[in-house]
Amino acid sequence: LWHNYGKSTIGSKEDIERVKAPSLKQFYKKYYQPDNAVLVIAGKFDEKKALSYVQQYFGPIPRPTRKLEPPYTVEPPQDGERNVTLSRTGDIQHIALAYHTPPLADNDFAANEALLEVITNNPSGVLYKKLVETKMSSGLYGYSQTLYDPGFSYFQVDVPMDKSIDSAKHVLLTTLDEVNKMSFTEEELTRSKNILLKSIEDLNSKTTDLAIQLTEYIG
């Protein structure tokens, strides 16, 4: 609610429609500067020639004299759970849960990723077995945000219209509440790690995806 992560990158539609040109120019001059930008070049190319082009086109841009202040807003501890119900016309029901998690650089982040893979894996994960195999849900997934500051782990369960969303939500919440009491086999953990390592290997074979991911981590 307080941290800027909760705000749209370029503002809401209403912001864009109402903002004045002088404010846009001021924002551009302050933030669109060499010390606040990253250039990623990916693919098969001549390194020396690429660097010469970078120097030619970006080198003349002067170093800014202003200094950017680091963000100081810290999301305060959450006082209890928050629930939001969104009603729309459609042919599927969704349950979404988010739990606070540490930032990407935290020592516990990798362990959290492995745990997430273990419990959401198709078809061996405990959530898959309890929700999809029992026909309460048609599918589910989970992921963690990879951020500089603390973020959240997200779970989504898809529930057919002829099934009870309340029952599926109860099973989901109950299972996640019991995760800290569960024990997992070495085989499950190894499989989870291998899946995560394979995703990194696949990423390294896709030039565009790798470049985009690098900018995400740098940012």
What are these regions (language model features)?
Residues 1-14, 36-42, 93-103, 129-219:
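M16 family metallopeptidases and their MPP-like homologs
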Residues 38-103, 203-204:
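An aromatic/glycine/proline-enriched structural segment found at the starts
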Residues 47-51, 107, 163-167:
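Short, conserved charged micro-motifs
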Residues 58, 119-123, 173-181:
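Short amphipathic alpha-helical signal-transduction/dimerization elements
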Residues 97, 107-119, 126-129:
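Active/ligand-binding-proximal structured segments within catalytic/core domains
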